[in-house]
C-alpha cells in the first residue's frame, strides 16, 4: 500500500481484542478494528485502553486500520 493512499485519523482505544487487535473510536465517532504496526511491535510499545492513537485507514476498507503512533 503506497503511503499516499492511506487516511490518517486520531482516535481513542476503546477495547483490547485477541491477537493484538484493538477497537478504536475515531474522532468522527466511527469505530474501527485496528492492529499494531510492525515498528511498534518491534519496539515493544504497549497500548492500553484509553490511549490516544493515530490510525492509518485504507480507502478500500474503512472498518479496519493500523495503529502507527501512540500519544503520551
Curated annotation (Swiss-Prot):
SMART domains: S1 (SM00316). Residues 1-72 form the S1-like domain. One of its GO terms (cellular component) is cytosol. Keywords: Cytoplasm, Initiation factor, Protein biosynthesis, RNA-binding, rRNA-binding. It comes from the Bacteria. Its main location: cytoplasm. It is found in: Cytoplasm. This is Translation initiation factor IF-1. It comes from Photobacterium profundum (strain SS9).
Amino acid at each position: 500500500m503506497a503511503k499516499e493512499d492511506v487516511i490518517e485519523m486520531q482516535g481513542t482505544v476503546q477495547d483490547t481484542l485477541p491477537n493484538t487487535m484493538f477497537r478504536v473510536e475515531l474522532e468522527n465517532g466511527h469505530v474501527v478494528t485496528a492492529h499494531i504496526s510492525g515498528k511498534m511491535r518491534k519496539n515493544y510499545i504497549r497500548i492500553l485502553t484509553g490511549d490516544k492513537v493515530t490510525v492509518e485507514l485504507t480507502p478500500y476498507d474503512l472498518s479496519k486500520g493500523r495503529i502507527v503512533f501512540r500519544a503520551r
